[in-house]
Amino acid sequence: MSKFLLRPYFKGLRLLLIACWIIAPSFAIAQVDDAQTGKAVFEVLASEIALQRGEAGLAYSTYMEMARQYKDPRLAQRAMEIGITGGSPELALNAAKTWENLSPSSQTKPKEVLVTLLILSNRWSEAVKPAIALLKQQNPSQRESTLAQLQALLAKAKDESDALRAFYEIASTAKPDIKDPSLLYTYAMSAEKAGHLDVMEKTLREILRKNPNDANSLNALGYSLADRNIKLQEAFALITKAHQLSPKDSFILDSLGWVNFRLGKNTLALEQLQQAFKMKPEADIAAHIG
């Protein structure tokens, strides 16, 4: 038999193996009758054939119906994979929710995937509950790794404030375990967005105790104090040090201008703010110039 004639045979064998891989474990546990098992295998085969023919929607729908009927998370997982491959994030997300709901609570992979898909869909607030559930099942090292992944996704958020508030709620679950300075800084900024200025200040001071030359933390703490018009001398000292460490940073120069304005040094403040705006014409800097 030529290798060309063997291709359909191996293709059919592959489909059968997929069906058995998905169906066999759960049906063995459930101890259903042979007729029901045969029907399920047929439906899986039909779905995979439909998928190969370009009928991804039909394959997806069949897998989702089967997942609900047989309470089998692996069928929902397969539907999710079809949704992702087909470039249908909403369908993939719906399947991921079903996968997570049907899976044993001890399994973390469905939660990881669900959280990622929710965040990529800019549904940060919806991601809070499954993300917290995931963190509670992880060890400290795993928690920090998960938070680092979420931190990287903040840059893709359409609504940064909403994303940071959600990040704060999630990260608060693991705060005692966070050691990475970058994560602590993001946690501090998220605390500010969530309205917890006390937590922000405490976290920034924690960073500075370990690294007194962290320019971003110096600037963030100093600006927060200046913006609230409190501890202005400390704010000036913090921002001045940050400026010395990063003299070309327009946002730090903006903070320096702002604290000088709070201190009544209006001429110097205006000069620094205008210079900062010239370096980076951002709306936040322009607002300080007035």
Locate predicted features.
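Bacterial N-terminal signal peptides that target proteins for export
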Residues: 2-16
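Intrinsic disorder/low-complexity segments in short proteins, especially the signal peptide
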Residues: 10-11, 20, 47
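Bacterial N-terminal signal peptides
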Residues: 14-25
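Sec/Tat signal peptide C-region and signal peptidase I cleavage site
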Residues: 26-30
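Alpha-solenoid helical repeat scaffolds
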Residues: 31-290
